[in-house]
């Protein structure tokens, strides 16, 4: 019995400092919560077969992120989780889901380079789930620690291999920013 108590105490001492987090703070920003439920889904098409680079803007909206954060903390890492569902009805296409976070004074979210470029392939009468996590980068860290930003999601379709018109619907299911910070000294 004493041996078990000793092992439990030893495990507690070993794991205690690990839970402290070295004064890190993890902040989660549900970007999807800024988008009205009716605006999280939309249709695309009809897009004729044989076209390259047909873009459909799904989201272009102002969001409030983490007010005052950048002046009191240093960002250790930032990630962005993205989840979408495409319910394609007709036609086929390859494409790219592009995610943008522009400064809030921008007239459009699409005036800056995308933070994410996710490939997607659509076939007739098929449902495709797209899910990815964008790793930390200076651009992502800067974007997620602004007070306000303009969020954009665009899909670019290439229907050159399709024999029929591309048409279907898209639902954005997850846009989650995770920022790990450390207090500035």
Task: Give the label of every model feature segment.
Residues 1-20:
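Sec-dependent bacterial lipoprotein signal peptides
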Residues 15-35:
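Bacterial Sec signal peptide processing site at the extreme N-terminus
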Residues 28-51:
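Post-signal peptide N-terminal segment of mature Sec-exported envelope proteins
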Residues 49-72:
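Short beta-strands within extracellular/lumenal beta-sheet-rich domains
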Residues 73-91:
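A short beta-strand element within beta-rich, extracytoplasmic domains
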Residues 90-111:
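Short, surface-exposed beta-strand/strand-loop-strand elements in extracellular ectodomains
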Residues 120-170:
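Cysteine-clustered segments with highest specificity for TGF-beta superfamily mature ligands
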Residues 172-185:
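Short, low-complexity, Pro/Ser/Thr/Gly-rich segments in the mature regions of secreted, periplasmic
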């Amino acid at each position: 019995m004493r041996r078990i108590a000793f092992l439990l105490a030893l495990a507690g001492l070993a794991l205690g400092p690990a839970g402290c987090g070295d004064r890190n703070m993890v902040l989660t920003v549900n970007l999807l919560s800024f988008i009205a439920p009716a605006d999280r889904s939309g249709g695309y098409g009809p897009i004729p077969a044989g076209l390259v680079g047909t873009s459909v803007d799904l989201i272009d909206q102002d969001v409030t992120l983490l007010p005052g954060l950048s002046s009191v903390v240093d960002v250790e890492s930032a990630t962005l989780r993205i989840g979408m569902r495409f319910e394609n009805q007709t036609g086929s296409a390859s494409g790219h889901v592009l995610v943008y976070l522009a400064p809030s004074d921008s007239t459009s979210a699409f005036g800056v380079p995308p933070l994410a470029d996710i490939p997607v392939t659509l076939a007739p009468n098929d449902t495709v789930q797209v899910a990815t996590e964008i790793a930390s980068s200076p651009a992502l860290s800067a974007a997620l620690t602004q007070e306000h930003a303009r969020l954009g999601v665009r899909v670019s379709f290439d229907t050159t291999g399709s024999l029929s018109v591309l048409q279907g619907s898209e639902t954005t299911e997850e846009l989650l920013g995770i920022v790990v910070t450390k207090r500035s000294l």
